[in-house]
Amino acid sequence: MKTLSMTSLLSGLALFAAPAAFASSTTSIPAFEASISTAQGPLSPGGATILRSELRTAMEAFIYDTGGPQGVDSAERAYLTTRLNDTPFQQSLTGTAAKYYADFYELNDATFTSYPLYQGSVAGTAASLFGATGPLASNADIREGYIPNGQGIANQATLGTAFTTYFEPPVGPFQPITVKELIERLGTTSIKGSTPSVDEVEGAVAYITQISRNSNRLYVADWTCRRCSFSPWNTRGYVIAAVSTDRRFVRMVSVWTADFGND
């Protein structure tokens, strides 16, 4: 396990100690509805049908505000429940868009309790687990573990807290992804100026989806860190979380993609 630097540790404690700030339903719901109207407008590539990419953009109103990442509060959750049970609305979504809505709704449960998700280092290097060497394997940190039976499930708060606790960097909100989107993220994101090899990507996808194959629960989040203990530089990257069917076992693969200064 990494030894946390005092700067990053204090930053993390401040993050968790600060009062939770949430996107107000008075602004997020109208913003969502406006995006949906645009997605069903004459200039939309899907016409009256809402595409997954359009829905994802619309639903960001519930987790982002001008101040940064925000959480889904109880009023927003009630609205999302109404829309989940709105048959005409659900029928206007493509199949993958409907899956995104359901996954987003499940993850962002307006329960701001972080359940005890342990993340321990795995046996073997990323290269051995992916079956290939290259920039992806060289810059991947892999951990996995359980929430004890009866002590909760992997929701938004749990994933975020576990990542920062065991990997160190503060992290943005997790969002659902498909296997196709996982392949795109792993294969097209530059890692310190290099492109991952096909073998690395295929190996990583196989390894990650061992956990999510039956559950179809895959999530991605971006992270940045100011002078984390593992680098004298400011760093950034992303993390993939694969969650089991019972939402208790989680495998996380964090990828360090770039340095961007040491101020």
Outline where the language-model segments fall.
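N-terminal "domain-start" segment
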Residues: 25-41, 51, 91, 96-216
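Mature, folded catalytic cores of secreted/periplasmic enzymes
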Residues: 69, 205-208, 255
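Structured segments of extracytoplasmic/periplasmic soluble domains
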Residues: 61-69, 83-90, 104-107, 211
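A short, surface-exposed interaction/processing loop segment used at functional sites
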Residues: 90, 95, 110-125, 232-234, ...
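Short, charged early-sequence alpha-helical segments and their helix-coil boundaries
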Residues: 71-83, 90-103
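Gram-negative bacterial Sec-dependent N-terminal signal peptides
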Residues: 1-22
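Exposed beta-strand-loop-beta-strand "reactive/processing" segments of non-cytosolic proteins
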Residues: 216-240
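Carboxylate-dense, calcium-coordinating segments in secreted/extracellular and ER-lumen proteins
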Residues: 40-44, 51-82
